[in-house]
Amino acid sequence: MTTPPKSRRFRSQAWFDNPDNADMTALYIERYLNYGFTQGELQGGKPIIGIAQTGSDLSPCNRAHVDWVRRVRDGITAAGGIPLEFPIHPIQETGKRPTASIDRNLAYLSLVEVLHGYPLDGVVLTIGCDKTTPACLMAAATVDIPAIALS
């Protein structure tokens, strides 16, 4: 007779459903209630999916993502997840002086910190140029969470 495998817990449950750290769990839940989530949503086993937003008015090659992300949010919700969108350091090669060459590394480092430090179970990476693509892919690989790239 074999024992059934343990059910896989989402990474975010360390924040929102951790009986070994009830005080911090209560604090995290209280903070995220400000987003309009319910305690039931946060503790209900739904995956929390980050949306790494590279689109902005400062980044023309990624500007389309500002509109596309609305559909991504709707898709995550329809699939039973909880979407959380956050910005990434903007990069535009031709608009920044003296150079945008260091921006890829800044975007990478800041994204690693967000992916590691927040209760995200996966991430949608919005990419669109030779700086955001490697920055986002390297960050997701570094943190080792499920990721999909939208270009």
Give residue spans per PLM region.
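Metallocofactor- and cofactor-centric catalytic cores in central/energy metabolism, strongly enriched
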Residues: 1-151
